[in-house]
């Protein structure tokens, strides 16, 4: 019985010591705000970079805005010019 109690207490102490050394970590960037905008043209091979530059060229956008974007082709009816959809996230 003594051995069982000592074993349980030692397990609790070891668990407490391990958990007391764990530190909370914040993410480096917080991608909290989403922006979905259509732009003319196709994505091509550098669609992400094109979306980022188009978002930064928007009126009122800060020049030092850090954005992460994905580019996808948008459905358009036959006879209309191609469009791409930029799905972007930025720190708000």
Curated annotation (Swiss-Prot):
Cysteine pairings via disulfide bonds: 33-92, 43-71, 51-86, 69-88
Main localization of the protein described in the UniProt heading: secreted
An example Gene Ontology biological process: signal transduction
Record InterPro entries: SCRL
Cellular location(s): Secreted
TM ranges: none
One Gene Ontology cellular component: extracellular region
Signal peptide residues on this chain, from the entry's feature table: 1-27
Keywords assigned by UniProt, alphabetized: Antimicrobial, Disulfide bond, Fungicide, Plant defense, Secreted, Signal
Highest taxon above the source species: Eukaryota
Pfam family, one: SCRL
Family: Belongs to the DEFL family.
Protein name: Defensin-like protein 226
Organism: Arabidopsis thaliana
